[in-house]
Amino acid sequence: SDGRDAAANDKATDLIALTARRDPCCSNPVCTVHNPQICG
């Protein structure tokens, strides 16, 4: 990813943290690995 994506991800971190436990991605190990910012 580039710097612009990182900045956007930083701004979204709080919202992601609130929704992570309900995100269906987080019950999929492959998705979790590719989206650590969502599922941590």
From Swiss-Prot:
One of the GO BP terms on file: negative regulation of signaling receptor activity
Localization of this protein: Secreted
Chief localization: secreted
Record keywords, A-Z: Acetylcholine receptor inhibiting toxin, Amidation, Disulfide bond, Ion channel impairing toxin, Neurotoxin, Postsynaptic neurotoxin, Secreted, Signal, Toxin
Name of the protein: Alpha-conotoxin PIA
Domain remarks in the Swiss-Prot or TrEMBL record: The cysteine framework is I (CC-C-C). Alpha4/7 pattern.
S-S pairs: C25-C31, C26-C39
Pfam families: Toxin_8
GO MF entries: acetylcholine receptor inhibitor activity; ion channel regulator activity; toxin activity
Keyword Transmembrane on entry: no
Function: Alpha-conotoxins bind to the nicotinic acetylcholine receptors (nAChR) and inhibit them. This toxin blocks mammalian nAChRs (alpha-6 or -3/beta-2 or -3 > alpha-3/beta-2 > alpha-3/beta-4) when heterologously expressed in Xenopus oocytes. Does not block the muscle nor the major neuronal nAChR alpha-4/beta-2. Discriminates between nAChRs containing alpha-6 and alpha-3 subunits, being selective for alpha-6.
Residue numbers carrying Cysteine amide: C39
